[in-house]
Each structure stands twice: as structure tokens, then as C-alpha cells.
Amino acid sequence: MGADVVGGIPHYEPAREFGEKSIYDTLELALKYDKLIDVHCDETDDPNSRFVELLNAVVLMEGYGEKTTASHTCSFGSADNSYAFRMMDLFKKSKMNFIACPTENAYLQGRQDTYPKRRGLTRVKEFMEAGINIAFAQDSINDPWYPMGNGNMMNILDNGIHLAQIMSPEEIEKDLDLITYNGARCMHIQDKYGLDASKDANFIVLDGDSSFDVIRNRAPVLASVRKGEYLFKRKPVEYEVALDLGIKY
């Protein structure tokens, strides 16, 4: 099998039973070929769309949670608390990963709502507090689902921390993980990823002095390095402002 990941989109199936079968089929293929799983799961406002429950159950039983990601899970943001917190206990047991796409989820969800109008995101803040791996991503680059997508992860992070309300001093120190280390865990490359000695020199350089600065300013990328070689680099932006101090020499 030439693919790296087996995917599915059960909530698009014409009936619940077909969606459930697609989850079993996805897991069967992934186990057969030892591939990762990434399911576009419950990308809907409908709180009765609960395919994430079945996906979590089957990967929990197979011990495959760390190699599985449930993307979007927008309906989980509409679920009642008693169900949500019961499920989060099970998510912790399976160690399944989650991905939210802040711009797409906010743009596409809540279309049938009047007011109050849902934000469209899954329970990002609660996942972080519970120690469940959650990452931010963008799955639409200038396409019909989200025409404004350009792959700028600092923009994704900025939107995500507003929509998920994660801007306390303690949260800001962890927010960059949402577009770095947490994503690496979703891709199951956490052992290769990072700045530790002996790991490949793959990183970007942002124009800022701290996590707070680069997040607040949506800092531009000054350099991108891949295996120790520059893919590109540029100088920081400089400004010149003419000042008239009214002094004659």
C-alpha cells in the first residue's frame, strides 16, 4: 500500500450504519498495512453525530490510539457536558489524537444557527486541560471549503487561540505546541521531531524574542531549515521614518 495514512469521513455516508462500516474498514486497512489513521470525524454541528465514540472504541480495543487522529470533531463542541466528559476519560485511555482546523471550522459551522451562534470548534481547551493531544491545522488551501486558506500556521494559531479562549499566561507558553510538537505526535514522528541533539535539523526561525511576542505579532518566518540546509532566509523588516524636529543647524 503506497499511502502513508488511511482516512475516512463517516458523517458523509448516507446512513449511520454505512458510516460505522467505514470506520471498521479504515481500521482494518490500517492494521493490515501498519499505517496511520486520520478520520474527518463529525465535521458537523449535529450533536447526534458521534462517530468519534466508535472510532475511539475500536482503536482503544486494538491499542492503536497513538497512531490515530480524529480531525475536526466539531459536533463534540455541541455535545452536552455529561457525554463530553465521559468521552474524554475514554480518549485519555486510548491516547487518540485530535486536530482542529480553526479557520475552516469557524467558517463552515454554525450556518444553520441564528443566535446564539456556535463557534464550530471542538473542545480544544478541555482537551489541553485533560492532557489529550490536540493540534491545530489547515486542510483547505484556496479551495471551495475555505477560499482564504494559505497555509500560514501563525494565522491558524492566532484564530485558534481566540476561538478556543486559551490566552492565559500559562496557556500562551503552551500555545505554540498546537502547531509544532502536538502535530508531530499526530503524525507519529515525535521521536524524530524537535531541537534535541541527534535529531535532524528541521526548523523555522520566527522574528521575535518570546512565545508571547511571536504569537501576538503573528511573527513572519525569517528562515526555514531542512536537514541543516537553508530552504530560504530573509532579513527582518526594517522601517525608516523621517522626523522633523524643527531644529535648524
Describe the role of every protein-language-model region:
Residues 173-249:
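Active-site microenvironment of metallo-dependent hydrolases
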Residues 14-15, 45-47, 106-108, 143-145, ...:
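Short secondary-structure capping/turn micro-motifs that flank functional sites
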Residues 19-20, 50-52, 111-113, 146-151, ...:
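Short secondary-structure transition/capping segments
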Residues 13, 75-76, 103-106, 139-142, ...:
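Short, glycine-/Ser/Thr-/acidic-enriched flexible segments
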Residues 36, 57-68, 104-108, 118-206:
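His/Asp/Glu-enriched, well-ordered alpha-helical/loop segment
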Residues 16, 78, 108, 170, ...:
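Glycine/Thr-rich phosphate-binding loops of Rossmann-like dinucleotide-binding domains
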Residues 99-101:
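Oxyanion-binding "anion nests"
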Residues 1-97, 113-136:
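Histidine/acidic residue-rich metal-binding segments in metalloenzymes
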